[in-house]
Amino acid sequence: MNSRTADRFWKCYSELPGTIKKHAKEAYKQFREDPYYPSLHFKQVHSTRPIFSVRITKDYRAVGIIQGEDIIWFWIGKHSEYDKILKQLRRT
C-alpha cells in the first residue's frame, strides 16, 4: 500500500507539538514496513467507506481514505478531535 497525503494533512501536521511530529514520523516508518503492526491499531472507522485510522500515540490519531493501492492521509490530530471527525464522517 502506498502512503500519500492531502494538503489538509500537512496543515494539521504543522500545528502539532514537536514530540508528536516525531511520533508521527516513527508511526509512518512503521506503517511503511507493516500497516498492520499491532501498535498502529490500523483499522477501518467507517462502515461503508474505506476510511481508516492509525494510532500515533495514546492521544493522537491520523485518518486516511484508501483509493486503489493508495491510502491518502487527510487528517492528524488529538483524539478528542478525532472523535468529532469520526462522528461527522459517519453521518455521510
Language-model features: where?
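Tryptophan-centered motif/residue detector
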Residues: 10, 28-31, 73-75
